[in-house]
C-alpha cells in the first residue's frame, strides 16, 4: 500500500512539474506582451521602446536563469512562493508603468528625459524578467531530475508560450482590455499554485494562494473602473479609454472640446480649424467634387467640411472600428450628425486593403495620424501613393497633411518631408506643398494651379461659410516666401523615397524624436539613414577584424568558443526578429495586437 501511494505521489509531482513549465511559458509570453503594450503607451507609441524592452527583458531572464543554475534544487513550496510573488509583482508593475510619468515628475503630454525613460524600463522589466528566468531554470531542473531531458522541458515550456501568445491576440480581439488580460494572466499563475497545493495538502500555501486569487478576482471585477482610474492619471478629463488591435484609444472632453489620443499621442481634437484649411484649400484644385474618398480622421472635421461642397457621395474608410464606437457618443452634435448623413458611407477596413478595389474618385483625402511610427508610416509610402493614384479619376486629386514647422526646417525634418514628397511624386507627377505649421500636400496626374485669382474665384463661387480660408488667405499662402522656400529645401535634400521596405521617413522621425533628448542631433546631416563616413567605416572594420582575431586566437578554448558562438547566434537572431517586427508593423500596422505571436 505504501509503495502504491509513493508511485501515485511521484506521478502527481511529474504532472505538476509539467504544469509548472506550461504556466511559466504562458506567463513569460503573455506577461511580457501586457508589459510591452503598457510601455508602448507610456512612451507614446515609439516602436524603439519595443526594441529596448526586448533587450532588458532578455537581460532579466538571463540573470534569473544564471542564478538558478546553481546546484540548489528548489522544493515545491519555494516554487509556489515565487509564483505568487511574480503574480503580485506583475500587478504592481502595471500600476507603476501607468504612473511612471507622474512618479518621475513628468508634465502632461511631455517626454521624460531619455535616461529617466531607460531607468523606468529597467525597473519595469528586469525584476519580472529575472523571476521568469529563475522559474524556468528551477522548474526545468525539477523536471530533468525525473529522468527527463532539458530539451523536453523547453518544448513543454514553449507550449505554454504558444498558448500565451494566442491569448494575447485573441483576448484583445474580443475587446478585453490589456489590464484585464494582465489580471487573467496572474489568475492562471496563482491557480496553478492552488491546484498543486490541494494535491499535497499544503495548508499555508493553499490559504495564501486562495487569498491572492480572491483579491485578483475582485480586481478583475473592478478592472474597467481601475483601468479608467489609472488612465486618468495622465488624462484629467477622461471620458473613455479602450484597447483596440491597433493601439490604445483615449478620449477626453472639456469645455465642449473632445480630444482623441492614440497611444497617448494627441491625434485629433474638435475645436480646430485645421480640417477647414485642409479640406477647402485642397479641393480648390479641382472643379469635380462628385465622389470623395476619406481615409481616416473623418470624425475630426473632414466630413462636415466636405458636406459644405456639392458632393454626391463620400466613402469614409476607418481602420479602427473600436475608435468610432467609443467616440460617437462623445462627439459634438454637428460632427456626430455628419457621420450619419445620407451621402456618407462609413466602411471599416484597412485603407490599403480598401484601395485594392477598383473604385475611382474625384478626390482622395488622407486623414491618417502623423508618420510618427512604423504603423502610421505605411500611409505615406511610395506603395500607398501608387494605390491612391490608381483609385483617382483622370483629373482627380490626392491630399494629406503632416505636422511641420512654419519658419525653420531642421535637416531631419527636411529629409523626412522630402522623402514623403518624392514618394508622392513617383506616382503623381504634379505636387504642391502648402506652407504652415501643418504642411498640406496636394498631388494630381493633371496639372495643378498656383493662380490665386482662379483659386479665389472658385472659392467665391462655392459660397462657403469659413472661419479661416478666404481669398486673402489663399493669396497669402501661395505668394509668401515660405511657399518658394519649401521647393528649395526639398530640392536640396538627398532625394530619398519613402517606401515600405526603405522607410526613410520613419528613420528621420525617430531622429526627430531623439533630438528632444539630444539637441546636438539637430545638426546631424542625415542620421540613421546613411552609411558612416569613411573614417568611421574604417574604425568599424577594424573592430570587426579585432573581434574575429580574438576569436581565432582563443578558438582552442571550448568555453570561449561557446560564448562567442552563442553571442553571435543571439545577436543575429535578435536583429532578425527586430527587423521582422518593424517590417510587420510597417506593412500591417497591428503590432499592438500581434506582438505576442511575433515574439513567440
What is each residue range found by the language model?
Residues 2-452, 456-468, 479-600:
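Alpha-helical transmembrane segments of multi-pass membrane proteins
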Amino acid at each position: 500500500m505504501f509503495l502504491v501511494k509513493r508511485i501515485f505521489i511521484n506521478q502527481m509531482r511529474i504532472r505538476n512539474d509539467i504544469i509548472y513549465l506550461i504556466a511559466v511559458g504562458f506567463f513569460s509570453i503573455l506577461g511580457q506582451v501586457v508589459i510591452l503594450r503598457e510601455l508602448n503607451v507610456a512612451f507614446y507609441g515609439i516602436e524603439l521602446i519595443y526594441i529596448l524592452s526586448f533587450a532588458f527583458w532578455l537581460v532579466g531572464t538571463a540573470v534569473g536563469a544564471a542564478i538558478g543554475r546553481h546546484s540548489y534544487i528548489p522544493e515545491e513550496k519555494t516554487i509556489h512562493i515565487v509564483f505568487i510573488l511574480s503574480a503580485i509583482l506583475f500587478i504592481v508593475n502595471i500600476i507603476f508603468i501607468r504612473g511612471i510619468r507622474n512618479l518621475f515628475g513628468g508634465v502632461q503630454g511631455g517626454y521624460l528625459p531619455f535616461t529617466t525613460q531607460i531607468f523606468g524600463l529597467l525597473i519595469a522589466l528586469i525584476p519580472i524578467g529575472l523571476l521568469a528566468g529563475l522559474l524556468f531554470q528551477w522548474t526545468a531542473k525539477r523536471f530533468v531530475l525525473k529522468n527527463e531531458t532539458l530539451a523536453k522541458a523547453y518544448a513543454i515550456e514553449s507550449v505554454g508560450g504558444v498558448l500565451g501568445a494566442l491569448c494575447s491576440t485573441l483576448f484583445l480581439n474580443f475587446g478585453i482590455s490589456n489590464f484585464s488580460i494582465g489580471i487573467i494572466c496572474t489568475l492562471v499563475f496563482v491557480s496553478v499554485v492552488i491546484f498543486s497545493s490541494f494535491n499535497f495538502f499544503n495548508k499555508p500555501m493553499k490559504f495564501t494562494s486562495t487569498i491572492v486569487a480572491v483579491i485578483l478576482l475582485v480586481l478583475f471585477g473592478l478592472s474597467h473602473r481601475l483601468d479608467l482610474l489609472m488612465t486618468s492619471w495622465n488624462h484629467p478629463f477622461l471620458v473613455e479609454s479602450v484597447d483596440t488591435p491597433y493601439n490604445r484609444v483615449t478620449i477626453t472632453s472639456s469645455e465642449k472640446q473632445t480630444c482623441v489620443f492614440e497611444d497617448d499621442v494627441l491625434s485629433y481634437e474638435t475645436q480646430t480649424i485645421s480640417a477647414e484649411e485642409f479640406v477647402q484649400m485642397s479641393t480648390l484644385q479641382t472643379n469635380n467634387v462628385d465622389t470623395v474618398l476619406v481615409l481616416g480622421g473623418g470624425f475630426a472635421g473632414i466630413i462636415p467640411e466636405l458636406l459644405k461642397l456639392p458632393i454626391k457621395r463620400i466613402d469614409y474608410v476607418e481602420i479602427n472600428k473600436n475608435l468610432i464606437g467609443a467616440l460617437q457618443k462623445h462627439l459634438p452634435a454637428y460632427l456626430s450628425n455628419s457621420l450619419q448623413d445620407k451621402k456618407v458611407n462609413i466602411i471599416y477596413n484597412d485603407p490599403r486593403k480598401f484601395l485594392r478595389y477598383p473604385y475611382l474618385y474625384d478626390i482622395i483625402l488622407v486623414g491618417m495620424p502623423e508618420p510618427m511610427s512604423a504603423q502610421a508610416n505605411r500611409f505615406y509610402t511610395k506603395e500607398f501613393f501608387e494605390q491612391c493614384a490608381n483609385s483617382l479619376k483622370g483629373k482627380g486629386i490626392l491630399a494629406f497633411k503632416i505636422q511641420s514647422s512654419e519658419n525653420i526646417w531642421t535637416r531631419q525634418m527636411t529629409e523626412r518631408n522630402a522623402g514623403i514628397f518624392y514618394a508622392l511624386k513617383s506616382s503623381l507627377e504634379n505636387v504642391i506643398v502648402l506652407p504652415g505649421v501643418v504642411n498640406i500636400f496636394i498631388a494630381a496626374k493633371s496639372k495643378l494651379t498656383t493662380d490665386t485669382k482662379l483659386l479665389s474665384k472658385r472659392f467665391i463661387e462655392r459660397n462657403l461659410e469659413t472661419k479661416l480660408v478666404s481669398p486673402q488667405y489663399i493669396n497669402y499662402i501661395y505668394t509668401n516666401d515660405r511657399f518658394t522656400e519649401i521647393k528649395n529645401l526639398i530640392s536640396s535634400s538627398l532625394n530619398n523615397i519613402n517606401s515600405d521596405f526603405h522607410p526613410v521617413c520613419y528613420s528621420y522621425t525617430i531622429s526627430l524624436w531623439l533630438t528632444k533628448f539630444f539637441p546636438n542631433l539637430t545638426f546631424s546631416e542625415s542620421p540613421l539613414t546613411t552609411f558612416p563616413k569613411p573614417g568611421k567605416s574604417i574604425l568599424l572594420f577594424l573592430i570587426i577584424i579585432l573581434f574575429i582575431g580574438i576569436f581565432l586566437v582563443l578558438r582552442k578554448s571550448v568555453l570561449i568558443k561557446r560564448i562567442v558562438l552563442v553571442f553571435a547566434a543571439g545577436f543575429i537572431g535578435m536583429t532578425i526578429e527586430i527587423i521582422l517586427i518593424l517590417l510587420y508593423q510597417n506593412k500591417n500596422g497591428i503590432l499592438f495586437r500581434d506582438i505576442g505571436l511575433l515574439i513567440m
